[in-house]
UniProtKB/Swiss-Prot annotation:
SUPFAM superfamilies: Histone-fold. It comes from Pyrococcus sp. (strain GB-3a). Keywords: Chromosome, Cytoplasm, DNA-binding. Belongs to the archaeal histone HMF family. This is Archaeal histone A. It is found in: Cytoplasm; Chromosome. Its main location: cytoplasm. Binds and compact DNA (95 to 150 base pairs) to form nucleosome-like structures that contain positive DNA supercoils. Increases the resistance of DNA to thermal denaturation (in vitro). Homodimer or heterodimer with another histone. Dimers then assemble into higher oligomers, with the DNA wrapped around the protein core. The keyword Zinc does not apply. Residues 20-22, 54-57 are annotated as: Interaction with DNA. CDD domains: HFD_archaea_histone-like. One of its GO terms (cellular component) is cytoplasm.
Amino acid sequence: MGELPIAPVDRLIRKAGAERVSEEAAKILAEYLEEYAIEVSKKAVEFARHAGRKTVKAEDIKLAIKS
């Protein structure tokens, strides 16, 4: 874990209306977002392979999000 930088996650929380964000809150959200992104990516890879491709395309990501 730890691939996502905390600063952009902090900005997302502030964009949602928070005036202040604890470092722990930003870290927890970053961990969740990273886990979610990995799960979506795994599904997208499966869709690409099923289509006979090695390259994951935007359509694979979109399908993975919907599934």
